[in-house]
Amino acid sequence: MKHTTLIRAIALAMLGVLAFSRAAAAQPPDAQGVVTVLVTPRPANTFVAAQALGAGVDGLGQGGVAKAYTPVNLRAMRSAGLGALTYRLRTELAVEAWHWNPSGHWSEGAKAQGYWTSEALAGAPISTCYGYRLPRRGSTIDQANNDGYSRLDDGDARTFWKSNPYLDRHFTGEDNAKHPQWVLIDLGRRRPVNAVQIAWGTPYATQYQVQYWDGDSSGEDAHSIDDTFGDGAWRMFPSGAEAEGRGGLVRLRLAAVPRSVRFVRVWMTRSGGAPVGTGDIRDTLGYAVQEIGLGTWDGRGGFHDLVRHTPDGKQQTPITVSSTDPWHQAGGRDPNVEQPGFDRVFRSGLANGLPVLMPAGVLYDTPGNAAAELRFLRARGYPVTRMELGEEPDGQYVTPEDYGALYVQWADALHRVDPALGLGGPSFQTAIDGWVCWPDARGDRSWLHRFLGYLKRRGRLADFSFFSFEWYPFDNVCAPPGPQLVLAPNLLENALARLQQEGLSRRIPWLITEYGYSAFAGEAEMTWPGALLNAETVGQFLTLGGSAAYLYGYEPNVPIHEIEDCPTWGNLALLLSEGAGRSPRPLAAYYAVRFLTREWAQPDTDKPQTVYRAKSGLRNRLGLPLVTAYAVHRPDGQWAVLLLNKDPKKAHPVTVRFQKAKSGRPVSFSGPTDLYQYSASQYVWHPDKAHGYPSLNLPPRHLQASGRPLMLPPFSLSLLRGPVAGLP
């Protein structure tokens, strides 16, 4: 999940606070708002509810899979009414190889090590599967449990980082200079640097540069690797180029006078390979480094290392790498990362008999393991029509060209098994300001534009049949949620517009494969803000032409504390876990989902439902909506209008009208109209750290609308549904 910086999140929250401070002047307390549904000749979108309103299942902690997939939990999950399912791949975020079948084959079978391929033949049921840690890991930080460490500064000369062999010209068919591999060191603050020490492994780089980040035009220092994607530049140290590297222990004096730098990277463009006869060709490809140091030479020729060397990811100097070799060993199973087994998922009933959007491990896996996965699913007879390749390559700092090169190889392997299989991705993390990377030679920083360009140059754009991304818009779970919610529609609309500007075709499906309030745990997720954001995300995404949205947090869960300097507890969850054998309690998010699956969209039908745009007159002086609306015309002929009041303190009256044409007279609901409302009258969250619970927990109220302006309670969901005379 791509995280905006805290500064950006605070800025957005401040903008929202300003919006709310001006709202009173813009909208008197007794002002009536008008919501107008624009009944245009062509609807904004068409969808099938079971296919468009979905959820995701993910990897869990130790013992978590068996605890989550109990009969009582599965009944509660299915009762939310969600249809399609996507399988999320936590092992890919953990920098681990995925053994989706515990049975399989090692490339070095006698030693139970090497490159793994799970067994494709259907055998015993698979209930749980695991990730395996990579002993050639280079990055300190990962996006899962973050309990690993880099081998580049672990202080052990016997270990080493090695880049992914599938990015070598042997597999890509391209010159290695087109897929430079790199190591980036973050010193934490500006430090004097004029020397580097590299203990090369095998294979080593024969051509490389040592570069430093020079900052952007604002004059502000970069605080993370993400900040180096701005308009600054990587500059080579005066003596930072090596054109004829010979491996071994190398000490380079980079400059006569130390430079004050924070970020330094080693940029590798040519490999010396490994000696012939070393066995598996993959062991001979790429680059390997045993240990790296960075610092200064003193006047007596001594090297003063600024890098902290320890096998502890919390203590060592943070390092990020371009890729990692998926070679591993049988003893590397991570007990803290479990994935639900395929048989457990497909037999759970959660997919409702629909095709499941399945992943293939890419960044830390092999094409053969992906092909075996597909053969297994076909042998079992499980419905799979699409596979998502990898997870969050952008958040793991993989360049678009490297991901593209892997994508093409995986597409070849999978299409040899099933030429009709739909492939897509890249499962972007959330990026409020766009998905960017270091600029290429043309200055292009757009991750998506460059990925699409790579596929086009390779003649492989047809292999990209759907686009997927995640949407968690609010990093700052400590900020007041009301002001943030007001910003939500603009954030999503701008993100989608940017994607189209960068070349993403509207002719392929766009999928939100995870959505929720935040990538971080906070109380907002357990109560109204999370419920409202979820409903808004689905309604707006479908209105803007999206194909499907998959909720994250399907499994029952409990509040957790994640942000050290903020006393907030929460989680992305529909249901509050009550322990073994007990029915989980529904949360606000659960009832918000049922608003969509049971009342807004017509349930239990595979007929298409049409979405129409709706505009709200309840806006503040900045033009930001206090009330938003999403309208659907159902197969049963009824119109359903979902109304969200994102004002945490004030109720707002609204009148819903339907405008068939600009010159036509607005019409209203004309027959018996159902009203559903869900607000603080039905749900109140009692915060108590890990033991928080709903102190009031009732389903939405249902009554007949009176025909008068409808009063929307503060922080509430409302829905009007009925016939409209003169409209089909």
Regions found by a protein language model. Give the residues of each.
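Extended extracellular/luminal ectodomain segments enriched in beta-structured repeat modules
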Residues: 178-180, 188-195, 260-261, 637-638, ...
